[in-house]
């Protein structure tokens, strides 16, 4: 699913843990066995990945990853300033000034889409559980 933050195109994907691990290893470093990710924002490809193996967490994970995407889109990352150790109150206020309205709009727009995906995953899980019992 394609969407925009400012003029930057982003893609939202719902993926399995296995797919998420592959993306992590491609972009960052080898994955440690037993670890898992609920979500991942890849600024270099403008992609947000949401782990569909955890349907109950999808909404909060999307909100979290969307903030990473907003920070990347508006070049507000503290990683851009190697001397900066954390965000100040002023930094956070500037972030909300620059992209707060857009962030809130996107959260509202994606809420029904994420709910639909979550419900589809839960229905599939319920069918799998019912099949195993029979």
What role is predicted for each listed range?
Residues 74-78:
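Active-site catalytic pocket residues across diverse enzymes, especially alpha/beta-hydrolases
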Residues 51-53, 64, 124-126:
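Compositionally biased, intrinsically disordered low-complexity segments
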Residues 60-72:
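Active-site recognition of the HExxH zinc-binding catalytic motif
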Residues 118-134:
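Glycine- and charge-rich intrinsically disordered segments
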Residues 80-121:
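Post-HExxH zinc-binding segment in Zn-dependent metallohydrolases
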Residues 1-58, 72-73, 86-89, 98:
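Active-site scaffold of zinc-dependent metalloenzymes
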